Amino acid sequence: MKMAVKPLDEVKDASKILAAIKYKSFAKAFFAVKKWTDPKPLGFDLELMPLTDLSNVHVGDMVHFDVSFMGKPFSCTQDTIQYMTATSNTFGGPDNFSLYSYLINGKAQFRMPSAGQWVVNVYVRQDVNPDGKLKELVGKCTTVWYAGTISFNVKP
């Protein structure tokens, strides 16, 4: 084993460590059997929900998403620019372009430019401090990263 996961309070001389990260990832893939039914939230810390029938998306269609963090709509603030990305190996060729949509009132949307498999992502960074929501992690890590992902296919 080359690496082991340990909380800061179990590391000798942890004062030399600049950052310790806890990573929480949530992923969903959507498809329909016979017909699309609107999915229900699963209660993830970072929840991405499609507001569009993802079983029948074609090039040029708009797809809409609802994003919540800790049960509340996740949005841009005056301090942060929150956004959702969309990527596909069929868009951008070797340059690997991505689409970006700002999260406003917990909503994001994209007009799909190419057919193929697409992945949308949202990342959230929360610093750990004694006065914050993550105070139980003080001494164990410095930052918590949340990742939410949805994959779906776009038809020609």
Regions found by a protein language model. Give the residues of each.
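Short tyrosine-centred short linear motifs in exposed loops/low-complexity segments
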Residues: 58-60, 112-120
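Short, aromatic- and glycine-rich surface loops/edge beta-strands on solvent-exposed regions
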Residues: 1, 116-126
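Beta-strand-rich domain onsets/edges
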Residues: 2-64, 68-80, 130-132, 136-153
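Short beta-strand/loop motifs in extracellular/secreted proteins, especially
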Residues: 80-82, 118
